[in-house]
Curated annotation (Swiss-Prot):
SMART domains associated with the record: Col_cuticle_N (SM01088)
Functional description taken from the UniProt entry: Nematode cuticles are composed largely of collagen-like proteins. The cuticle functions both as an exoskeleton and as a barrier to protect the worm from its environment.
PANTHER family: COLLAGEN, CUTICLE COLLAGEN 91-RELATED
Protein known as: Putative cuticle collagen 91
Similarity comment text for this entry: Belongs to the cuticular collagen family.
The keyword Disulfide bond is annotated on this UniProt entry: yes
Chain intervals for the UniProt region annotation (Disordered): 84-109, 140-278
One GO CC annotation: collagen trimer
Molecular function per GO: structural constituent of cuticle
Listed Low complexity bias regions: 99-109, 172-228, 236-245
Residue ranges with Pro residues bias: 89-98
Region (Triple-helical region): 91-120, 137-199, 202-264
Length: 278
């Protein structure tokens, strides 16, 4: 059993085919009507031209003799009751007479020879030959409306309009999300070497308060030997005595002079000028 989608597709195709057939039939019907009206207009024009040509040929085939004989017959039909004149001079012209009675219709002329084909007439007209000039006939009835013509080409694009006035400023939008941290910048170039600092000796500050007593120092060096005494009498050797106690430490020596400044070390900050040498 076909599915619903297959039935829908078949129905759509059938509908399109029916619409196409109806559209084609409408176009063919319009073409047939247009061809019929064009053919009838051509046929009516041909009949008018044929009638005008026949009338012109009939008028041109009547000879002057037939016209005169017909006039003589009309004059002979009138009564002749007056006396005949004998060598009388002509009198003055009389007044115009009354209009005569209508003459009898003339005899129909013989049928004219068959005309040349239409194509030959066109060639004769182009060559400068004599052609029958037929008066234009009455305007025929209005034809049926023709089929709509095809859509014309697109027009040229119009000129750009004048620029509008600037619109009012819109409300301030919400703050955007924080951006990602930027990449670390490249290391900067080395700066110029700084100028050499000025060397100076600070003024010694005031003496501070005495500090606490420090721990006992280590034993001092043995004192220098005394001057040799006068030789005494040799006594009996005595017993070795106990070692004597250590002597008191000697006083501190004087402070030495300041040493010369040492050479500059590696790159390091210079000491502040207000520093005090201890």
């Amino acid at each position: 059993m076909p599915s619903a989608s297959t039935i829908s597709v078949i129905s759509a195709i059938s509908g399109v085919a029916v619409l196409g057939a109806l559209l084609t039939a409408t176009i063919i019907f319009n073409d047939i009507n247009r061809f019929y009206y064009e053919t009838m207009e051509t046929f009516d024009e041909f009949k008018i031209n044929e009638k005008n040509a026949w009338d012109t040929m009939v008028m041109s085939t009547r000879s002057p003799k037939e016209m005169l004989l017909g006039r003589a017959r009309r004059q002979a039909a009138l009564p002749d009751c007056q006396a005949l004149a004998k060598n009388c001079p002509p009198g003055p012209p009389g007044p115009p007479g009354a209009p005569g009675a209508a003459g009898e219709p003339g005899v129909d002329g013989d049928a004219g020879a068959a005309g040349i084909d239409g194509v030959a007439i066109q060639f004769a007209s182009a060559a400068g030959g004599a052609c029958i000039q037929c008066p234009a006939g009455e305007a025929g009835p209005a034809g049926a409306p023709g089929a709509p013509g095809p859509a014309g080409p697109d027009g040229q694009p119009g000129a750009d309009g004048q620029g509008g006035a600037p619109g009012p400023a819109g409300p301030e939008g919400p703050a955007g999300d924080a951006g990602a941290p930027g990449a670390p910048g490249a290391p900067g170039n080395d700066g110029q070497p700084g100028q050499n600092g000025q060397r100076s000796t600070g003024t010694p500050g005031a003496a501070g308060a005495p500090g606490p007593q420090g721990p006992v120092g280590s034993d001092g060096q043995p004192g220098s030997a005394g001057a040799p005494g006068a030789p005494g009498p040799a006594g009996a050797p005595g017993v070795d005595g106990q070692p004597g106690a250590n002597g008191q430490p000697g006083p501190d020596g004087e402070q030495g002079h300041d040493g010369q400044p040492g050479p500059d070390a590696a790159y390091c900050p210079c000491p502040a000028r207000s520093s005090v040498r201890q």
